[in-house]
């Protein structure tokens, strides 16, 4: 039976590795009674290389660290002004398939941007969300013990130049877009608030409980 309560954790600005390890710990130690959670965070500049990643897609990392991680997908960039959302969900309990979860995540971004009259869309052959063939949101998940972690990154109001140091998600020359320039959410906080609404509605959560920071381990 699905847990109809979703716990939202507002983490503020946090370094990537500490949040990644906290996600792993939560997933490894959760049981059938554990809450479904949505972690909302903003990271300092970092490139993360997924399990399918190839080193040749990192063109010139320069002074930005590269971290090899355990999510699906290839290389992407996180930095200030980007909304990062990690859904820590028991999809086995809620009977949601992995492909269905990916579709729900993409659609929640599309629905949120539609409120701002931005015509965004997903692609069957390239996970993420796009506007006029430019990528505005990236997606990479990991499923362990029937539970999801890692998640999505939505460009809101950021310096997009570091994306030119990589082939984003393995695609050479892929152009990026961001919300503020398109008349969408102007801040990471606004984007997080709006995306939480569309995501929880699509996944069938009826109650939202908000927390500041991570739970004490």
UniProtKB/Swiss-Prot annotation:
InterPro entries linked: aa-tRNA-synth_II/BPL/LPL, BPL_LPL_catalytic, Octanoyltransferase, Octanoyltransferase_CS
Keywords: Acyltransferase, Cytoplasm, Transferase
Alphabetized SUPFAM superfamilies for the sequence: Class II aaRS and biotin synthetases
Active site, UniProt feature: 169 (acyl-thioester intermediate)
Binding site for substrate: 71-78, 138-140, 151-153
UniProt EC number: 2.3.1.181
Keyword Repressor applies: no
CDD domains membership: LipB
One annotated Gene Ontology cellular component of this protein: cytoplasm
Compartment annotation: Cytoplasm
Residues annotated as site: Lowers pKa of active site Cys: 135
Known catalytic reactions: octanoyl-[ACP] + L-lysyl-[protein] = N(6)-octanoyl-L-lysyl-[protein] + holo-[ACP] + H(+)
Gene3D superfamilies tied to this protein: Bira Bifunctional Protein, Domain 2
One example of a Gene Ontology biological process annotation: protein modification process
Annotated family: Belongs to the LipB family.
Known role: Catalyzes the transfer of endogenously produced octanoic acid from octanoyl-acyl-carrier-protein onto the lipoyl domains of lipoate-dependent enzymes. Lipoyl-ACP can also act as a substrate although octanoyl-ACP is likely to be the physiological substrate.
Residue span(s) of domain BPL/LPL catalytic: 32-207
Gene designation: lipB
Additional observations: In the reaction, the free carboxyl group of octanoic acid is attached via an amide linkage to the epsilon-amino group of a specific lysine residue of lipoyl domains of lipoate-dependent enzymes.
Protein name in UniProt: Octanoyltransferase
């Amino acid at each position: 039976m699905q847990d109809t309560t979703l716990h939202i954790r507002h983490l503020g600005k946090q370094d990537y590795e500490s949040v990644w390890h906290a996600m792993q710990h939560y997933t490894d130690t959760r049981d059938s009674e554990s809450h479904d959670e949505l972690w909302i965070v903003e990271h300092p500049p970092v490139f993360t290389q997924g399990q399918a990643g190839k080193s040749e897609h990192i063109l010139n990392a320069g002074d930005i660290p590269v971290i090899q991680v355990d999510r699906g997908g290839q290389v992407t960039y996180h930095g200030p002004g980007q909304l990062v959302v990690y859904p820590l969900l028991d999809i086995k309990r809620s009977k949601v398939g992995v492909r269905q979860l990916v579709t729900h995540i993409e659609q929640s971004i599309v629905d949120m941007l539609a409120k701002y009259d931005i015509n965004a869309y997903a692609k069957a052959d390239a996970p993420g969300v796009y506007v006029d063939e430019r990528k505005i949101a990236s997606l990479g998940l990991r499923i362990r013990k029937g539970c999801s972690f890692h998640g999505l990154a939505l460009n809101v109001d950021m310096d997009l130049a570091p994306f030119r140091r990589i082939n984003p998600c393995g695609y050479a020359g892929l152009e990026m877009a961001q919300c503020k320039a398109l008349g969408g959410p102007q801040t990471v906080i606004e984007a997080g608030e709006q995306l939480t609404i569309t995501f929880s509605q699509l996944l069938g959560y009826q109650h939202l409980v908000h927390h500041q920071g991570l739970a004490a381990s």
